[in-house]
Amino acid sequence: MAIKKYKPTTNGRRNMTSSDFAEITTSTPEKSLLQPLKNNAGRNNNGRITVRHQGGGHKRQYRVIDFKRNKDNVAAVVKTIEYDPNRSANIALVHYEDGVKAYILAPKGLEVGMRLVSGPEADIKVGNALPLENIPVGTVIHNIEMKPGKGGQLIRSAGTSAQVLGKEGKYVLIRLNSGEVRMILATCRATIGSVGNEQHELINIGKAGRSRWMRKRPTVRGSVMNPNDHPHGGGEGKTPIGRKAPVSPWGQPAIGYKTRNKKAKSDKLIVRRRTK
């Protein structure tokens, strides 16, 4: 993937960048793997906003992704590399030998025509999925399960990767993309390689309208609201927030405040906290 730059024909185009989509091989998704995706604009079933700054944007369809990769010892051939509007990573359409079609996350280096296999006896090759106990120390992995059979939950964004550091009994030590070192059950599965589309983070949106296409609505500063809408609100003209430190609309400190549950049971599985 390369970054495409635009000439400054307008103020919105100046500094705007996008992907050149060179890795994408088709623009038509597999119909059998599509589901309708309703735009709830951040509202719950009561019609109340539960997630701010969402709404509008282009209509989408959900691509059903196989995060479990549990079809053992059945080879699959990569047919296409496709764009997915619902995630930063690209996806790959694979056809299994038994006729089943599935979408998977496209790792870096995956190409059309490559053969993939899942299972404990699979080769250590980009795109293959294995239990962590069968993956050698030092291997780069992604799409990592946290509970056996639940499907991958960690390391799914574009350009991310984790590394196997060691094995201790029924657990495997994993260094995550954040720098956190964590123990995960050895029977959980992961996929070999790092997630593709690694230059996604370099894309410059360029203008407000492009954010609106992506269902992102504007963020209003609390200091320009009324006092009944935000703790920073109120006052005559441009007044300070009237506090030692900024807070969220619900009064939670906004800078340096730890939000993790101090009694989280998973604390015993975290060997080293994240570094960034």
Swiss-Prot record:
<dbReference type="GO" id="GO:0003735">
    <property type="term" value="F:structural constituent of ribosome"/>
</dbReference>
<dbReference type="InterPro" id="IPR002171">
    <property type="entry name" value="Ribosomal_uL2"/>
</dbReference>
<dbReference type="GO" id="GO:0016740">
    <property type="term" value="F:transferase activity"/>
</dbReference>
<comment type="function">
    <text>One of the primary rRNA binding proteins. Required for association of the 30S and 50S subunits to form the 70S ribosome, for tRNA binding and peptide bond formation. It has been suggested to have peptidyltransferase activity; this is somewhat controversial. Makes several contacts with the 16S rRNA in the 70S ribosome.</text>
</comment>
<comment type="subunit">
    <text>Part of the 50S ribosomal subunit. Forms a bridge to the 30S subunit in the 70S ribosome.</text>
</comment>
<feature type="region of interest" description="Disordered">
    <location>
        <begin position="34"/>
        <end position="55"/>
    </location>
</feature>
<dbReference type="GO" id="GO:0002181">
    <property type="term" value="P:cytoplasmic translation"/>
</dbReference>
<feature type="region of interest" description="Disordered">
    <location>
        <begin position="221"/>
        <end position="276"/>
    </location>
</feature>
<dbReference type="InterPro" id="IPR008991">
    <property type="entry name" value="Translation_prot_SH3-like_sf"/>
</dbReference>
<dbReference type="InterPro" id="IPR012340">
    <property type="entry name" value="NA-bd_OB-fold"/>
</dbReference>
<dbReference type="Pfam" id="PF00181">
    <property type="entry name" value="Ribosomal_L2"/>
</dbReference>
<keyword id="KW-0694">RNA-binding</keyword>
<keyword id="KW-0687">Ribonucleoprotein</keyword>
<comment type="similarity">
    <text>Belongs to the universal ribosomal protein uL2 family.</text>
</comment>
<protein>
    <recommendedName>
        <fullName>Large ribosomal subunit protein uL2</fullName>
    </recommendedName>
</protein>
<dbReference type="Pfam" id="PF03947">
    <property type="entry name" value="Ribosomal_L2_C"/>
</dbReference>
<dbReference type="InterPro" id="IPR022669">
    <property type="entry name" value="Ribosomal_uL2_C"/>
</dbReference>
<dbReference type="InterPro" id="IPR014726">
    <property type="entry name" value="Ribosomal_uL2_dom3"/>
</dbReference>
<keyword id="KW-0699">rRNA-binding</keyword>
<dbReference type="InterPro" id="IPR022671">
    <property type="entry name" value="Ribosomal_uL2_CS"/>
</dbReference>
<dbReference type="InterPro" id="IPR014722">
    <property type="entry name" value="Rib_uL2_dom2"/>
</dbReference>
<dbReference type="InterPro" id="IPR005880">
    <property type="entry name" value="Ribosomal_uL2_bac/org-type"/>
</dbReference>
<keyword id="KW-0689">Ribosomal protein</keyword>
<dbReference type="GO" id="GO:0019843">
    <property type="term" value="F:rRNA binding"/>
</dbReference>
<dbReference type="GO" id="GO:0015934">
    <property type="term" value="C:large ribosomal subunit"/>
</dbReference>
<feature type="compositionally biased region" description="Polar residues">
    <location>
        <begin position="37"/>
        <end position="48"/>
    </location>
</feature>
<dbReference type="InterPro" id="IPR022666">
    <property type="entry name" value="Ribosomal_uL2_RNA-bd_dom"/>
</dbReference>
